[in-house]
A protein has these predicted regions:
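Exposed beta-strand/loop interface patches that mediate assembly or binding
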Residues: 1-69
Length: 69
């Protein structure tokens, strides 16, 4: 089992870069990467270009929490 300190992440803000069958790729406002496809919580649908709050772990897992203006 991983130690809690090894599994921490932060809530980030970003923009939907791509919509795929396997989830959404998000480009964070801070940083120079694009996430692997991650799901949206509660099955909410988003459009490319929408601003979202999300979390993303180093192992490529994460989720989109909500959209914002």
């Amino acid at each position: 089992m991983e130690a809690i300190s090894e599994t921490r992440t932060t809530i980030e803000r970003g923009q939907i870069a791509q919509k795929l069958e396997s989830g959404y790729r998000v480009c964070p406002f801070v940083g120079s990467y694009v996430t692997a496809p991650i799901p949206a919580l509660f099955g909410v649908a988003y459009d490319v270009g929408e601003n979202v709050y999300f979390f993303y772990f180093d192992d490529g897992k994460g989720a989109i929490l909500a959209a914002f203006d």
